[in-house]
Regions:
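Activation segment signature within eukaryotic-like protein kinase domains
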Residues: 115-116
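Catalytic-loop of the protein kinase fold
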Residues: 127-144
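A short, aromatic-enriched beta-strand patch in the conserved N-lobe beta-sheet
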Residues: 72-74
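Protein kinase glycine-rich loop
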Residues: 12-19, 23
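Conserved N-lobe beta3->alphaC-helix segment of eukaryotic protein kinase catalytic domains
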Residues: 39-62
């Protein structure tokens, strides 16, 4: 057991360990409140005095819900080691979340947006106070659950942090190699002598790698054998890649995110965005509302992100980019009713949707349905190596578990899609039937009116009504092997015919 004046902990309750300190779960001696204590080791005291106190000074300056709070600075009894008493985050770190097999292919979109919002807010507070972190990575982003069960992410570990204005530079090297800016990587990992100075944008590179890792479950730049086994190739990948190049399929949220990551993962600091532009672009994403659209031709659910002040025309264009259904051919159903979206209206008029209650999109164009497109999870199942290797076997088993969870996620998406597909087709057939009934009723009324006007010719008119009814039914539900697809397009045609029949009655 170890303790300070007000806090007590057991060395078995280790939360994390670094080169200069260890972090433990501790309790307040009086209240029993759980806290995290950072206990500095003897190696930490070999650093210059100003470096030793820098973390205390930085944390005292910060006060934000997305930054771990500092409660007190105390000392252990006998050894008089410095101890930082901080807020305890019970749900581990973002790294532990990403290490879970169900997130092997990235966080769910909703959870990723929570990470993005929290990291951006925390970093914005750092820059407002002129602080550069210098060691942004998933392991230094803690997670706890709010009162309503929502995730809250907080930046932590300010051992490498220091005050630095936008136009200032530093030459000391800190950080974790997978998340280091290439210029720092060259000097810290490859041990190549160079006298480059670094600015605040090195944090942007680390943020870009972290966000990519959270979105996809993997690092953006990985050489064969891994980044720690092939360091020279790792450096060449990051420095020789084309400007703006980044892996990732551009769909939904990713189409908004990829340009941001591409512009912060730039080696040349002159080409890299500054924090002002990064905050502006990420805020643009976070201020958008999501509209859930289920495409019947694709049998797929899409997330369309738009601003409330956008017009419906912008929404229709965004749907076109994801579904290839042109705006003039888009028709929507919502909760069983035809939903008419006027292009000039504000997007605020679009109904509130959820994943289980989306807008249902069908196309008025005679196109062949594209069907589902997904990657077979079996392709991601790794192979076990013949020789016994505990670490390799662990990684392989973890990869297999990740592929299993991906297959489960895909199966759930397919089942949900099947339900939405059946429901959408049911609504579509009901709409067709209602339109046909209205059109036939108008036609019948028109013929009755004509028969009363023609007198002796009424018998012929009755025969004509039967013929028209047969023709109408054959047009709406034509016979053939393709079944319902033949009766899909004429909704507007039937509406026009109904209007023409009404005009005949008025005459």
């Amino acid at each position: 057991m170890q303790s300070t004046v007000n806090y007590l902990w057991h060395t078995d309750d280790l939360l994390g360990q670094g080169a200069t300190a260890s972090v433990y779960k501790a309790r307040n001696k009086k209240s029993g409140e759980l806290v995290a204590v950072k206990v500095f080791n003897t190696a930490s005291y070999l650093r210059p005095r100003e470096v030793q106190v820098r973390e205390f000074e930085v944390l005292r300056k910060l006060n934000h819900q997305n930054i771990v709070k500092l409660f007190a600075v105390e000392e252990t009894g006998a050894s008089r080691q410095k101890v930082l008493v901080m807020e305890y985050c019970s749900s581990g770190s973002l790294l532990s979340v990403l290490e879970s097999p169900e997130n092997a292919f990235g966080l769910p979109e909703e959870e990723f947006l929570v990470v993005l919002r929290c990291v951006v807010a925390g970093m914005n507070h750092l820059r407002e106070n002129g602080i550069v972190h210098r060691d942004i990575k998933p392991g230094n982003i803690m997670r706890l659950l709010g009162e309503e069960g929502q995730s809250i992410y907080k930046l932590t570990d300010f051992g490498a942090a220091r005050e630095l204005d936008d136009d200032e530079k530093f030459i000391s090297v800190y950080g974790t190699e997978e998340y280091l800016h290439p210029d720092m990587y060259e000097r810290a990992v490859l041990r190549k002598p160079q006298q480059k100075a670094f600015g605040v944008t090195v944090d942007l590179w680390s943020i870009g790698v972290t966000l990519y890792h959270a979105a996809t479950g993997s690092l953006p730049f990985v050489p064969f054998g891994g980044p720690r086994r092939n360091k020279e190739i790792m450096y060449r990948i990051t420095t020789e890649k084309p400007a703006g190049a980044i892996a990732g399929t551009q769909r939904g949220l990713q189409s908004q995110l990829v340009p941001i990551l591409a512009n912060v993962l730039e080696v040349e600091q002159a080409k890299c965005w500054g924090f002002d532009q990064f905050f502006a672009e990420t805020s643009d994403i976070l201020q958008r509302a999501v509209v859930h659209v289920f495409s019947l031709p694709q049998a797929a659910l899409h997330h369309v992100y738009i601003h409330a002040h956008n017009t419906v025309a912008i929404f229709l264009e965004a749907v076109y980019k994801q579904t290839n259904v042109a705006p003039q051919h888009q028709e929507y159903l919502f909760e069983g009713h035809l939903c008419v979206l006027e292009p000039n209206l504000s997007a605020q008029h679009i109904a509130h949707t959820t994943a289980s209650s989306p807008l249902t999109l069908f196309s008025m164009a005679s196109e062949t349905p594209k069907g589902l497109a997904f990657r077979d999870p079996a392709l991601d199942i790794p192979k076990f190596v013949p020789k016994v290797d505990l670490q390799a076997d662990y990684n392989t088993a973890k990869g297999a578990m990740g592929a299993g969870y991906q297959a489960l996620r895909l199966a759930r998406a397919l089942l949900a899609g099947q339900e939405l597909m059946l429901r959408g087709l049911h609504w579509f057939v009901e709409m067709l039937q209602a339109t046909c009934r209205r059109t036939l009723e108008v036609t019948r009324t028109s013929l009755l009116f004509l028969s009363s006007s023609l007198g002796p010719e009424s018998d012929k008119a009755d025969d004509g009504a039967d013929a028209v009814r047969a023709v109408q039914e054959e047009e709406v539900f034509p016979r053939g092997r393709n079944g319902l697809r033949h009766g899909r397009a004429p909704v507007k045609q039937l509406q026009r015919r109904g209007a023409a029949g009404s005009a005949t009655l008025l005459l």
